[in-house]
């Protein structure tokens, strides 16, 4: 199959990604937080947080899940929220804790949530 999208790539962009070299998505987030600490990470409405702040919030949420809710690796966490600044904090915090994120639609009825 011809992969015609490669024609639009700059010559410096590789056509293949070594996903094993990247680690987990949490590893990528943590590396980005270290490398781009003072750069904007997320913006929602009129609020922007940088990678350093995002990492602090993620670590705090991870601690909350483990120490207050006593969630363990493999436990599931249903996440029902709109596209807010808190969403990436919750997702990365849960993943960092080894918790499985189960995204749910805020418009689901109680019957659909069963």
Enumerate the language-model features and the residues they cover.
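Structured binding elements
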Residues: 98
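Conserved AMP-binding/adenylate-forming core of the ANL superfamily
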Residues: 17, 21, 38-92, 109-114
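Anion (oxyanion) recognition and catalysis
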Residues: 95
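Short beta->alpha connector loops at strand-helix junctions that form conserved
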Residues: 104-106
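AMP-dependent adenylate-forming
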Residues: 3-5, 27-50
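Short low-complexity stretches enriched in small and charged residues
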Residues: 1-2, 8-9, 33, 56, ...
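Flexible, non-catalytic linker and terminal segments flanking ANL/adenylate-forming cores
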Residues: 1-22
């Amino acid at each position: 199959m011809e992969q015609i999208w490669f024609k639009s790539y700059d010559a410096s962009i590789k056509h293949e990604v070594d996903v094993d070299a990247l680690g987990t998505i949490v590893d990528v987030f943590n590396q980005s937080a270290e490398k781009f600490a003072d750069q904007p990470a997320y913006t929602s409405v009129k609020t922007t947080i940088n990678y350093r702040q995002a990492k602090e919030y993620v670590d705090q949420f991870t601690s909350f899940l483990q120490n207050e809710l006593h969630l363990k690796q493999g436990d599931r966490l249903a996440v029902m929220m709109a596209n807010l600044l808190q969403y990436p904090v919750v997702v990365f915090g849960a993943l960092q804790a080894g918790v499985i994120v189960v995204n749910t639609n805020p418009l689901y009825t109680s019957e659909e949530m069963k």
